[in-house]
């Protein structure tokens, strides 16, 4: 083998060696990223749980039966009105699509 072939072989082996070393680094980074992601998820879930518990406690402390009845009444009236208008809109849309027969 000539010196050129030996030099080319050495360069190819050197490049392959760096590729192998470079391929191992992202796997370690992925493991670090997954642990970081897990930590972020756990902290967000703990914040969510504490916020939810605080909101439930506040609701229980300020619960008023008269206000609850008013809210339920408003909900039932608004639901009835919306269902009426949705029915009218559906009939108009069907007659528009169906056309004159």
Swiss-Prot record:
Q: Which UniProt keywords apply?
A: Chylomicron, Glycoprotein, HDL, LDL, Lipid degradation, Lipid metabolism, Lipid transport, Secreted, Sialic acid, Signal, Transport, VLDL
Annotated stretches, region: Lipid binding: 66-74
Q: Which cellular component appears as one GO term in the record?
A: low-density lipoprotein particle
Q: Where is this region: Lipoprotein lipase cofactor?
A: 78-101
> Where does the record locate the signal sequence feature?
1-22
Q: What is its main location?
A: secreted
Task: Kindly provide the PTM information from the record.
Answer: Proapolipoprotein C-II is synthesized as a sialic acid containing glycoprotein which is subsequently desialylated prior to its proteolytic processing. Proapolipoprotein C-II, the major form found in plasma undergoes proteolytic cleavage of its N-terminal hexapeptide to generate apolipoprotein C-II, which occurs as the minor form in plasma.
- Name by which UniProt lists this protein: Apolipoprotein C-II
Highest taxon of the lineage:
Eukaryota
Q: What does this protein do?
A: Component of chylomicrons, very low-density lipoproteins (VLDL), low-density lipoproteins (LDL), and high-density lipoproteins (HDL) in plasma. Plays an important role in lipoprotein metabolism as an activator of lipoprotein lipase. Both proapolipoprotein C-II and apolipoprotein C-II can activate lipoprotein lipase.
């Amino acid at each position: 083998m000539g010196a050129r072939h030996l030099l080319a072989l050495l360069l190819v082996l050197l490049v392959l060696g760096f590729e192998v070393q470079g391929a191992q680094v992202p796997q370690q980074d992925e493991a670090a990223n997954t642990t970081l992601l897990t930590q972020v998820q756990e902290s967000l879930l703990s914040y969510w749980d504490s916020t939810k518990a605080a909101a439930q406690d506040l609701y229980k402390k300020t619960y008023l039966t008269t206000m609850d009845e008013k809210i339920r009444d408003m909900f039932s009236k608004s639901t009835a009105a919306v269902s009426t208008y949705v029915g009218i809109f559906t009939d108009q849309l069907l007659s528009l699509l169906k056309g004159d027969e």
